[in-house]
Curated annotation (Swiss-Prot):
Gene3D superfamilies: Anthopleurin-A. The keyword Phosphoprotein does not apply. Expressed by the venom gland. GO terms for cellular component: extracellular region. Transmembrane segments: none annotated. InterPro entries: Myo_ane_neurotoxin_sf (IPR023355), Myotoxin (IPR000881). Belongs to the crotamine-myotoxin family. Disulfide bonds join 26-58, 33-52, 40-59. This is Myotoxin.
Length: 70
């Protein structure tokens, strides 16, 4: 029975994250995920959280060079 629990846990973790689809919505907007402490310039290039991980946000790729970290 323990083997079944371990097998289920392994399968669950294996399919939990799909690396090919990470941040798909942000990338479709032409953005990239950055920590929330980064300020995107101009402000219109800040798309918000979208599908980025916790405490990260989506900024337009062109604003990467202009990003300011607090």
């Amino acid at each position: 029975m323990k083997i079944l629990y371990l097998l289920f846990a392994f399968l669950f973790l294996a399919f939990l994250s799909e690396p090919g689809n990470a941040y798909k919505r942000c990338h479709k907007k032409g953005g990239h995920c950055f920590p929330k402490t980064v300020i995107c310039l101009p402000p219109s290039s800040d798309f918000g959280k979208m599908d980025c991980r916790w405490k990260w946000k989506c900024c337009k790729k062109g604003s990467v060079n202009n990003a300011i970290s607090i």
